[in-house]
Amino acid sequence: MMNIVENQTVVRRAPDNAGEERVLAARPEAIGFTPQQTALIVVDMQNAYASQGGYLDLAGFDVSATAPVIANIKVAIAAARAAGIKVIFFQNGWDNQYVEAGGRARPTSINPMRLKTMRKRPELMGKLLAKGDWDYDLVDELQPQPGDIVLPKPRYSGFFNTQLDSLLRSYGIHHLVFTGIATNVCVESTLRDGFFLEYFGVVLEDATHQAGPEFAQKAAIYNIETFFGWVSSVSHFCDAVGYKTEQNAA
């Protein structure tokens, strides 16, 4: 449940942007942004992470509560597009031989649950998180449109070995609004790396879902709002950009 304090201090990148500024209610304080300098980041909304029969489900994680998250992300995407905010989708995975995943003498080949799952169930090799397979595909409800950007990523962070930073700088973007799965893994990893690169990161709490128990979501949200960024909600995001839904019009 969001607990946003009204009439709070507003964090601004530069005072001279006030003419175009929108203000997003958030924790620990409201944050000002301009749509042209903001991107909505949709992290790994693939069947692997959000659907029954996908990688997380097969690995023993509960994905039964992802439907409302998908619906909320769909609203956030519509609001972003209507406001002229760039929408960037990430897809995590590799080729079906996992050559792009790298060699075996590395921690990222030993520790990740996805590779452990495939070692336990070799029949899944070439299917889990493999480009061109259903598991890698974005869920049907969240499909890119012309003008959106789709970036593959080989690791948890969307900044590592991708075009993200150079694309954001070329568009003059410095505010990032995060949605997706998993809050405590790829969402938090990308937001943290963005913070280190001087991006303002906001996570829409009700448009994310954790991998693991509920405390993993709470811990990730605590880390973000305390150390690395801001936390808001889809309804507050819609309010900030002037996008009307049945919920926020009531």
Swiss-Prot record:
Q: Does the keyword Hydrolase apply?
A: yes
Give the CDD domains listed for this entry. cysteine_hydrolases
Q: List the disulfide bonds in this chain.
A: none
Quickly give the catalysed reaction: (Z)-3-ureidoacrylate + H2O + H(+) = (Z)-3-aminoacrylate + NH4(+) + CO2; (Z)-3-ureidoacrylate + H2O = (Z)-3-aminoacrylate + carbamate + H(+); (Z)-2-methylureidoacrylate + H2O + H(+) = (Z)-2-methylaminoacrylate + NH4(+) + CO2
GO BP annotation list: nitrogen utilization; uracil catabolic process
UniProt keyword annotations, A-Z = Hydrolase
Pfam families registered for this protein in UniProt: Isochorismatase
EC primary class: hydrolase
- Domain of life of the native organism: Bacteria
Kindly indicate whether the keyword Hydrolase belongs to this entry.
Answer: yes
What is the recorded function of this protein according to its Swiss-Prot or TrEMBL entry? Hydrolyzes ureidoacrylate to form aminoacrylate and carbamate. The carbamate hydrolyzes spontaneously, thereby releasing one of the nitrogen atoms of the pyrimidine ring as ammonia and one of its carbon atoms as CO2.
This protein is called Ureidoacrylate amidohydrolase RutB
* Organism (species): Pantoea ananatis (strain LMG 20103)
